[in-house]
Curated annotation (Swiss-Prot):
<dbReference type="InterPro" id="IPR011335">
    <property type="entry name" value="Restrct_endonuc-II-like"/>
</dbReference>
<dbReference type="GO" id="GO:0003676">
    <property type="term" value="F:nucleic acid binding"/>
</dbReference>
<protein>
    <recommendedName>
        <fullName>UPF0102 protein Ccon26_01140</fullName>
    </recommendedName>
</protein>
<comment type="similarity">
    <text>Belongs to the UPF0102 family.</text>
</comment>
<dbReference type="Pfam" id="PF02021">
    <property type="entry name" value="UPF0102"/>
</dbReference>
<dbReference type="InterPro" id="IPR003509">
    <property type="entry name" value="UPF0102_YraN-like"/>
</dbReference>
<dbReference type="InterPro" id="IPR011856">
    <property type="entry name" value="tRNA_endonuc-like_dom_sf"/>
</dbReference>
Length: 113
């Protein structure tokens, strides 16, 4: 990944966090890493559900959400399980996808493949 792509991704995640805060989420962690993978954003909703949020962004005309393939999804699930065992074993949680297209945001909640 080049510098331009890195900066675009970071900017998109920054904007995603602001969008989530406006919806009432509290951002707990960003870019959580484990040996299994990474989770872009971990946030707590007003109803106290833990949200693991994968951010996909595009400035082009293609559908960013299709970049979440089965292999990436499985890595995220393993990372969630690791996080839950270590930090929040009894809390309700879900996996969400936040699509950023230019200035538009679409939060797709509780995704599965």
């Amino acid at each position: 990944m080049g510098l331009k792509e890195y900066l675009f991704g970071k900017s998109s995640e920054d904007r995603a966090c602001e969008f989530l805060r406006k919806l009432g989420f509290v951002i707990l962690e960003r870019n959580f890493h484990s040996k299994f993978g990474e989770i872009d954003i971990i946030a707590l909703s007003s109803d106290k559900i833990l949200h693991f949020i994968e951010v996909k962004a595009t400035s082009g005309g293609y559908e960013a959400e299709y970049r979440l393939n089965k292999a990436k999804y499985m890595k995220i699930l393993k990372t969630i399980n690791f996080y839950m065992m270590k930090n929040e074993p009894n809390r309700d949680y879900q996996l969400d996808l936040l699509v950023v297209k230019n200035e538009n945001f679409e939060l797709i909640e509780n995704i599965s493949l």
